[in-house]
Amino acid sequence: MSTEYGIALGMIETRGLVPAIEAADAMTKAAEVRLVSREFVGGGYVTVLVRGETGAVNAAVRAGADACERVGDGLVAAHIIARPHKEVEPVLALGNSSPDRS
């Protein structure tokens, strides 16, 4: 990969944690991508983010979306940004975030 996280950004949003885990597992097995974050959006929605080369991210997101659909009605959205603009990078949640419990 050309940078620490790669070039492309792949996103899958799910209803519930189980479809998100299934999608993350399928994405990392399907292609050479790095799982960089998962976000608990609220209301039971979870977003999983991967980075890597464009072709790998495309294959990973397709595999993750297919796996998520096999779990049930969990897939909300799947999207790929081939080359996110540098101004977008600070907005992305690229750490391991978790809900604030304080």
Curated annotation (Swiss-Prot):
Function description: One of shell proteins of the carboxysome, a polyhedral inclusion where RuBisCO (ribulose bisphosphate carboxylase, ccbL-ccbS) is sequestered. Assembles into hexamers which make sheets that form the facets of the polyhedral carboxysome. The shell probably limits the diffusion of CO(2) into and out of the carboxysome.
GO CC term (a single one): carboxysome
Pfam families named in the record: BMC
Cysteine disulfide links: none
Family: Belongs to the bacterial microcompartments protein family. CsoS1 subfamily.
Keyword line: Bacterial microcompartment, Carbon dioxide fixation, Carboxysome
Subunit (UniProt): Homohexamer with a small central pore.
Species the sequence originates in: Hydrogenovibrio crunogenus (strain DSM 25203 / XCL-2)
Any one GO BP annotation for this protein: carbon fixation
Major location (coarse): other
Chain segments annotated as coiled-coil in the UniProt record: none
Gene from which the chain derives: csoS1C
Residue ranges crossing the lipid bilayer per the database entry: none
Residues annotated as domain BMC: 8-93
UniProt subcellular location: Carboxysome
Protein name: Carboxysome shell protein CsoS1C
Induction, per UniProt: Induced by growth in low levels of dissolved inorganic carbon (at protein level).
Organism lineage: Bacteria, Pseudomonadati, Pseudomonadota, Gammaproteobacteria, Thiotrichales
Domain notes from UniProt: The tight homohexamer forms a small pore which is positively charged.
UniProt keyword annotation of Cell membrane present: no
